[in-house]
Amino acid sequence: MVLAKDLKSGMTFLNGEKLLRVMEASHHKPGKGNTIMRMKLKDVRSGSTFDDTYRPEDKFEQAVIETVTAQYLYSMDDIANFMNNETYEQYEIPVEQVKDELLYVLENTDVKIQFYGTEVIGIQLPTTVVLEVTETQPSIKGATVTGSGKPATMETGLVVNVPDFVEVGTKLEINTQTGEYLKRA
């Protein structure tokens, strides 16, 4: 059991039948009354996010999440296919469940598949990925690193705001947590 006051960002717990992941958690002490925990939560099974409040002493069952390293193979007919790197077992995950993560993943990229018991609940990406720009506005002569930048479409369909000097064919390092351009690869 885990107390609400001990829940941190990234932790997964059970609230009744719902499997919830903490996106953000903060203590809030109103002028009158008791302290409350404000949390932004994600229902792992449905993918929906919502805000909720709990008393610090509320107890929840902490979910044991296991991960295995797997390689993304391909997506077809709304199913993303992955292969366990050790056992070569293949996993099929509905694209709808991992559509945001797939914007950062090329075929043959290693990711971590998360399990709750035998149920696949999602994938965990590496912190950064290298993707190639497939579409962007042409560079402007004299453009510098500073400035507002321009949108660029990556080979996976991800759209990232990049500096003006970036051209089609450039490989860029992208942060998978924020979706931001980091540097040229």
From Swiss-Prot:
Function of the molecule: Involved in peptide bond synthesis. Stimulates efficient translation and peptide-bond synthesis on native or reconstituted 70S ribosomes in vitro. Probably functions indirectly by altering the affinity of the ribosome for aminoacyl-tRNA, thus increasing their reactivity as acceptors for peptidyl transferase.
Matches recorded under PROSITE patterns: EFP (PS01275)
Short name of any one Pfam family annotated for the protein: Elong-fact-P_C
InterPro entries referenced in this protein's UniProt entry, alphabetically: Elong-fact-P_C (IPR015365), NA-bd_OB-fold (IPR012340), Rib_uL2_dom2 (IPR014722), Transl_elong_fac_P/YeiP (IPR020599), Transl_elong_KOW-like (IPR013185), Transl_elong_P/YeiP_cen (IPR001059), Transl_elong_P/YeiP_CS (IPR013852), Transl_elongation_fac_P (IPR011768)
Membership in a protein family: Belongs to the elongation factor P family.
Domain of life: Bacteria
Organism listed in the record: Lactococcus lactis subsp. cremoris (strain MG1363)
Cellular localization per UniProt: Cytoplasm
Pathway: Protein biosynthesis; polypeptide chain elongation
Identification of the protein by name: Elongation factor P
First-listed, main subcellular location of the protein, grouped into a coarse class: cytoplasm
